[in-house]
């Protein structure tokens, strides 16, 4: 099946702007496949796996981001979760940070191709950019263990941002390991959402640092 057909099957029925999200998310995945011929953006390119692990994983917890004026995706890679969330939440401004220049150029090109006026791409390291900029929410999928993440996002936390990190099924163990670092920095870590990916492709946990 095509990306669009897979997404039609697996995305939640109550997802905002669902049909438009499916069309644009499928186009995003097509662009990744095209670009992967020249340099590696992701190893996940089969329609079913990409639809689940890239798009569904990004948008299932969309309600946590709803109503936030400005969301920062720290280390966006090929545009996840930032681009799918921006499709679902067109009224929210998104800044996608990606320090690898080729990937940043790809995300910028993809956002332009999709007509995402609510997306800005910056070729910067998250920990540097966040020292001088503010955000309502900072999120990331491929991020360091929580022990390090507490320090990486220290400036954003001091500026009042809410940190929402996509984690796997062992988040509680990470939270326990990070307890002393969190106490030292006077922040709190907690699980705010859990969900299962379709096809038994894994359990996911959203951890909040605040």
Curated annotation (Swiss-Prot):
It comes from the Bacteria. One of its GO terms (molecular function) is rRNA (guanine-N7-)-methyltransferase activity. GO terms for cellular component: cytosol. This is Ribosomal RNA small subunit methyltransferase G. Pfam families: GidB. It comes from Solibacter usitatus (strain Ellin6076). Keywords: Cytoplasm, Methyltransferase, rRNA processing, S-adenosyl-L-methionine, Transferase. Belongs to the methyltransferase superfamily. RNA methyltransferase RsmG family. Its main location: cytoplasm. S-adenosyl-L-methionine binds at residues 75, 80, 98-100, 126-127, 141. PANTHER family: S-ADENOSYL-L-METHIONINE-DEPENDENT METHYLTRANSFERASES SUPERFAMILY PROTEIN (PTHR31760:SF0). Specifically methylates the N7 position of a guanine in 16S rRNA. Its EC number is 2.1.1.-.
């Amino acid at each position: 099946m095509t990306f669009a057909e897979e997404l039609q099957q697996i995305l939640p029925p109550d997802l905002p702007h669902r049909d438009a999200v499916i069309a644009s998310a499928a186009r995003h995945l097509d662009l990744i496949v095209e670009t992967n011929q020249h340099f590696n953006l992701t190893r996940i390119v089969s329609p079913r796996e990409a639809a689940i692990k890239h798009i569904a994983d990004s948008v299932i917890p969309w309600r946590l981001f709803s109503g936030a004026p400005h969301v920062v995706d720290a280390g966006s890679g090929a545009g996840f979760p930032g681009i799918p969330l921006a499709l679902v939440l067109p009224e929210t401004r998104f800044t996608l940070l990606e320090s690898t220049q080729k990937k940043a150029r790809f995300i910028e090109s993809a956002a332009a191709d999709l007509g995402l006026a609510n997306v800005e791409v910056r070729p910067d390291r998250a920990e540097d950019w966040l020292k001088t900029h503010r955000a309502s929410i900072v999120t990331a999928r491929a991020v360091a263990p929580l022990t390090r993440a507490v320090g990486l996002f220290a400036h954003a936390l001091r500026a009042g941002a809410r940190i929402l990190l996509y984690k796997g099924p062992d988040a509680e163990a990470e939270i326990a390991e990070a307890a002393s670092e969190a106490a030292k920095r006077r922040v709190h870590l907690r699980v705010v959402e859990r969900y299962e990916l379709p096809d038994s492709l894994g359990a996911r946990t959203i951890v909040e640092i605040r």
